[in-house]
Amino acid sequence: MPISAETADTRVVARDAVVNTKIDRTTAKTREVHDIASRNATTRLLVETANDPIVVAVLFAGGKGAMNISRNGKIGWGNGNFLVRSRPYFLERGITTAIIDAPTDQKYDLRHGFRGSANHATDIGAAITHLRSTYNLPVWLIGTSRGTNSVVNAAVRLAADSADGIVLTSSMLTWNEKGDNLLGFDLEKISGPVLISHHRNDESRVTPPEGVRNLQSRLTNGGPMKVAWYRGGYAMGNPCHAAHYHGFNGIEEQVVSDIVAWIKQTKP
C-alpha cells in the first residue's frame, strides 16, 4: 500500500522541532518530518499520523539503523525493513507511526556500541517527550532485530522520559561482533508492558528462537508481558534479512494486528 504525499507546508511546532507536513490521501492523515534537538545533535523522525490515533509508535529498524530520511520525508535506507514496510497496517488500526533516524553525530551506523549507549537513550527520551507533548498520546517503542537493542536500552535507562510500553520483534539474543544483545542489558529494570514477537523458524544466528525463553525469564519486574509466536510466511535470501522469516515476510499484517491488540489491551 503506497504512501503518496500530495501537498506540503512547513511549520514550527516546538522550539526544538521543525516539522515538514505533507497531506496523504491514502493511509496516513499527515506526513511530517520532525528534527529533535538532543545533546549537541539532532535526531530526525518521519511521523505519519493515523485518523483518530490512540498511540504513537516509534519504529526502530534493525541493521545499521541509519535511515537517511530526507527533509521531504524520503527514506534513503531500509524501506524493506519489517516495521518500515508495515506502516500502513499500523495506520489502518489507529497507530500513528514515527520512524526514528540516526542522530546527526552518528548518522552512518548505530552498530558497534551506540545502540546500547547513554547518548542513544537520551536521544530517544527527547523523541518520546516531544511526541507525547505534540500529540497528547501514549508513546510506545517498537523495535525489530538490532532495533530491539535501542528499545531495551531506552527502557532500561530512562525514567521520566520512558515509553508507555515496548514491543520486541525478532529480538537480538546472542553475542555478535557488531553490537549488543538484549541479555546483556539490566532487563530487571524494565517496568512497563512488554510484548515479544518472534517467528518459530527465524534462522538468523543472532535472533535464535530458543533464546526467547532466557529473555522472558529476565523480565521479572515490569508490567504485563506476553510472548507471541508465529509460523508461516515466506523465506527468501539471507536468513538475517527482512525477506526471510526473520522479517515476518508474508505475515506482516497478522503480526501488526496482534501488536496493536496488545497495545490497546495494556495502554493506560
What are these regions (language model features)?
Residues 50-92:
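Short, surface-exposed "cap/lid" segments of acyl-processing enzymes
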Residues 9-52:
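N-terminal cap/lid segment of alpha/beta-hydrolase-fold proteins
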Residues 222-268:
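C-terminal catalytic histidine-bearing segment of alpha/beta-hydrolase fold enzymes
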Residues 82, 86, 108-134:
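Alpha/beta-hydrolase active-site loop
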Residues 165-230:
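The feature captures the conserved acid-bearing segment of alpha/beta-hydrolase catalytic domains
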Residues 87-107:
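Conserved alpha/beta-hydrolase
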Residues 129-189:
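Primarily recognizes the serine-hydrolase "nucleophile elbow" in alpha/beta-hydrolase
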